[in-house]
């Protein structure tokens, strides 16, 4: 629903995407093809250092069902089945990986005009249970998440946060790492082509502060340039060019001023969708 609050995992997502999305310092190739029946086929290859990884996936979308099947270069088969409108305002996702018989998981999401609930449980004898909830609206929401390990009967994660989105401004304040750190994010969309963002993290255990600032600017309708700088001395840049509809090439670079003997990190990603 358009007026419903975002899931807890999406609080602060705009800043995360601005500061991290498309910064790939490897070599990646993606080919997406769509059949006449609407089935999508995607082949992905990734070269990381001297290693190569790849996978082939098939995505089928029905009226109330989505089936995603993926086979990777390690001979693993991953399957995800999404059932929409299982109940009013609810959907369920069943996922598992072969040959890992303990990888099965069931996710359920319920969306209300003033609340969003997410739950996840492993389909094994000692599952990990994840619960998250947000209340409010599309503009202002408050929420939290917990993870419970049934094997050790202990809480492995608990976080809380608040998010704000309105008129080109997105801000979030999240208490995470079991209360050990506080993360604040801010994104300002100056105009349809330019955005600025920042992230500040305060770690209470060692009184350490870290921050990152970044920007995104559309040079023209086909080219986007992103930059980011952190207090650790790292500076990064992304240039993405759409050279045909839904196909783009991305160049990434990062320089660490504190590692003067190391070469800058460089990355290249090519995505094709005929």
From Swiss-Prot:
The keyword Transport applies. Keywords: Acetylation, Cell membrane, Growth regulation, Ion transport, Membrane, Mitochondrion, Mitochondrion outer membrane, Phosphoprotein, Porin, Transmembrane, Transmembrane beta strand, Transport. Its main location: membrane. Disulfide bonds: none annotated. It is found in: Cell membrane; Mitochondrion outer membrane. Induction: By the bacterial pathogen P.syringae pv. tomato. GO terms for molecular function: porin activity; voltage-gated monoatomic anion channel activity. The keyword Cell membrane applies. Widely expressed. One of its GO terms (biological process) is response to bacterium. InterPro entries: Porin_dom_sf, Porin_Euk, Porin_Euk/Tom40. Transmembrane segments: none annotated. The modification Phosphoserine is found at residue 76. Pfam families: Porin_3. Disruption phenotype: Dwarf plants with lesion mimic phenotype and increased expression of the pathogenesis-related genes PR1, PR2 and PR5. Delayed flowering, impaired development of anthers and short siliques with sterile seeds. The modification N-acetylglycine is found at residue 2. One of its GO terms (cellular component) is mitochondrion. Forms a channel through the mitochondrial outer membrane that allows diffusion of small hydrophilic molecules. The channel adopts an open conformation at low or zero membrane potential and a closed conformation at potentials above 30-40 mV. The open state has a weak anion selectivity whereas the closed state is cation-selective. Involved in plant growth and development at the vegetative and reproductive stages. Is important for leaf and pollen development and mitochondrial membrane potential steady state. May be involved in disease resistance. PANTHER family: MITOCHONDRIAL OUTER MEMBRANE PROTEIN PORIN 4, VOLTAGE-DEPENDENT ANION-SELECTIVE CHANNEL. Belongs to the eukaryotic mitochondrial porin (TC 1.B.8.1) family. Consists mainly of membrane-spanning sided beta-sheets. This is Mitochondrial outer membrane protein porin 4. The gene is VDAC4.
């Amino acid at each position: 629903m358009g007026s419903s609050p975002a899931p807890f995992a999406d609080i602060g997502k705009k800043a995360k995407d601005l500061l991290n999305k498309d910064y790939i310092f490897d070599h990646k190739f993606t080919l997406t093809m769509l059949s006449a029946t609407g089935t999508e086929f995607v082949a992905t290859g990734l070269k990381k250092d001297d290693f190569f990884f790849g996978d082939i996936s098939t995505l089928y979308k029905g009226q109330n069902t989505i089936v995603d099947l993926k086979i990777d270069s390690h001979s693993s088969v991953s399957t995800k089945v999404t059932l929409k409108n299982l109940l009013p305002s609810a959907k369920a996702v069943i996922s598992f990986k072969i040959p890992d018989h303990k990888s099965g998981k069931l996710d359920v999401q319920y969306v209300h005009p003033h609340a969003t609930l997410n739950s996840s449980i492993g389909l094994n004898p000692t599952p990990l249970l994840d619960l998250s909830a947000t209340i409010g609206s599309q503009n202002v929401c408050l929420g939290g998440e917990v993870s419970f390990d049934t094997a050790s009967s202990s809480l492995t994660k608990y976080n809380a946060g608040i998010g704000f989105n309105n008129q080109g401004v997105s801000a979030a304040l999240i208490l995470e790492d079991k209360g050990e750190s506080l993360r604040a994010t801010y994104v300002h969309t100056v105009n349809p082509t330019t955005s600025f963002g920042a992230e500040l993290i305060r770690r209470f255990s060692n009184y350490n502060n870290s921050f990152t600032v970044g920007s995104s600017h559309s040079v023209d309708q086909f080219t986007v340039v992103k930059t980011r700088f952190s207090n650790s001395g790292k500076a990064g840049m992304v240039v993405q060019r759409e050279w045909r509809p839904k196909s783009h090439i991305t160049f990434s670079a990062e320089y660490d001023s504190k590692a003067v003997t190391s070469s800058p990190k460089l990355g290249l990603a090519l995505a094709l969708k005929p």
